[in-house]
């Protein structure tokens, strides 16, 4: 893995740890937002390995599907939950939407699956 991709993946892992701590403290919205960003950084790491970079969140998820999923490097099932969580993250961050433990935990679990998949797919390159 390139140094830049490794930095991005480490950032994803750190955000996962932070999201777990926030969830344990009952801060569901903060945990969900942080978990989303953990997935985003994992996705950026995967794209970085292909020398790709997106300018927006929406563009990142689209590029990940078109290049990484289409090439069979990551499964759709680990990418789509995080892509679909973008709207929830925006509602939590910008509209003060309240969510419960279950929704935050689901997003954290999805982020963990994506981080793990990126580690497995790109970690030994």
Report the location of each language-model feature:
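Terminal alpha-helical segments
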Residues: 1-125
């Amino acid at each position: 893995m390139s140094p830049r991709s490794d930095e991005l993946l480490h950032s994803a892992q750190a955000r996962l740890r932070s999201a777990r701590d926030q969830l344990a403290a009952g801060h569901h919205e903060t945990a969900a937002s942080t978990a989303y960003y953990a997935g985003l950084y994992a996705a950026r790491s995967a794209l970085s390995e292909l020398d790709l970079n997106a300018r927006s969140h929406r563009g990142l998820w689209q590029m990940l599907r078109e290049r990484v999923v289409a090439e069979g490097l990551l499964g759709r099932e680990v990418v789509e939950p995080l892509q679909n969580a973008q709207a929830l993250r925006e509602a939590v961050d910008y509209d003060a939407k309240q969510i419960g433990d279950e929704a935050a935990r689901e997003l954290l679990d999805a982020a963990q699956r994506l981080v793990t998949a990126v580690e497995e797919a790109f970690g030994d390159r």
